[in-house]
Amino acid sequence: MKFSIIALALAVAFVCVAESRSEEEGYDVSEEIQAEELEEAARGGINRKLMEMVNKLRKVQGREDSEDAGRAGINRKLMEMVNKLRKVQGREDTEEAGRGGINRKLMEMVNKLRKVQGREDSEEAGRGGINRKLMEMVNKLRKVQGREDTEEARSLKDKVKSMGEKLKQYIQTWKAKFG
């Protein structure tokens, strides 16, 4: 968890520095970022994106005002996840969609969450049911992802390391220019 927070902080800092640099030098960083996103999606970005969503849902789950989060935040996040999964499942050329494994399990979990979400006793579901279902989903995702996590973690670690080095270089050039 600490590693992902550090990685996120580095990514945000990298983008901020790159954008300020691009404004000064008149070059567009959005193309570079878009290329990185496409590359990330090609390397199994689906699983990583789902884990990011799960981590965001954990933050919502941990809040003390779980009643409000249960009614508004979690439901909105779940609908975003459903829409993303529909887009992924609609692609016939995706390997995972072809095999059906990960996407089928996720759609089963989403359908279970929809049943909980649709109940009229939303207060009860918001406090306990959805949180329990989310933790079950986290555990299932961990089992599915555990097979390829080592390889992805290494590539992510290398990517974060290179981003950190780039960030250091940008900071040094910025300090050299502006003192």
Swiss-Prot record:
One of its GO terms (biological process) is killing of cells of another organism. The keyword Secreted applies. It is found in: Secreted. A motif (Processing quadruplet motif 3) lies at residues 96-99. Cleavage of the propeptide depends on the processing quadruplet motif (PQM) (XXXR, with at least one of X being E) and the inverted PQM (RXXX, with at least one of X being E). The modification Glutamine amide is found at Q61, Q89, Q117, Q145. This is M-zodatoxin-Lt4b.
